[in-house]
């Protein structure tokens, strides 16, 4: 069942990427699928409507919950990051005004703390939201990318 739900999310992301003008080859690379599967996604032949409905519910979730859910569906962190980024259009943000520099978020390899400043390595960050849930002051959050 998780594979089916993941297929629904991939289908929604494929359709979004197509609307942005990407080619099937480019979409296939982002969603880690072969081009024939992308063709099925874009034509509406796959997955079933029930699966797409579940994927749409995930898309409507607050990003931090959707991100955790998507990461639970696959062990491929790069795939999960690509899907989350395209599905929600987000990036991780640190609010320096509310941060107490407690270090709770530092279990994540993408974050560093130096002189009371949290650094975010966007290449290392998999948008898993673990740091968001660890932060006691809600200083880490997802925001829309511009």
Curated annotation (Swiss-Prot):
GO molecular function, one term: oxidoreductase activity
PROSITE patterns according to UniProt: 4FE4S_FER_1 (PS00198), 4FE4S_FER_2 (PS51379)
Residues involved in [4Fe-4S] cluster binding: 125, 128, 131, 135
Keyword field: 4Fe-4S, Iron, Iron-sulfur, Metal-binding, Repeat
Presence of keyword Translocase: no
Cofactor names: [4Fe-4S] cluster
Glycosyltransferase is among the record's keywords: no
Cofactor note: Binds 1 [4Fe-4S] cluster.
Protein name per UniProt: Ferredoxin-type protein FwdE
Gene: fwdE
């Amino acid at each position: 069942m998780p594979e089916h739900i993941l297929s629904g999310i991939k289908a929604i992301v494929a359709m979004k990427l197509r609307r942005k003008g990407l080619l099937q080859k480019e979409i296939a690379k982002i969603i880690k699928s072969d081009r024939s599967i992308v063709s099925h996604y874009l034509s509406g032949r796959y997955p079933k409507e029930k699966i797409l409905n579940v994927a749409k519910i995930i898309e409507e979730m607050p990003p931090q919950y959707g991100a955790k859910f998507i990461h639970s569906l696959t062990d491929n962190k790069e795939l999960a990051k690509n899907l989350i980024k395209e599905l929600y259009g987000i990036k991780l943000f640190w609010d320096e005004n509310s941060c107490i520099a407690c270090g709770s978020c530092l279990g994540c390899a993408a974050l560093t703390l130096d002189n009371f400043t949290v650094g975010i390595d966007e290449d290392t960050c998999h948008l898993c939201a673990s740091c968001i849930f660890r932060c006691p002051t809600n200083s880490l959050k997802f925001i829309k990318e511009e």
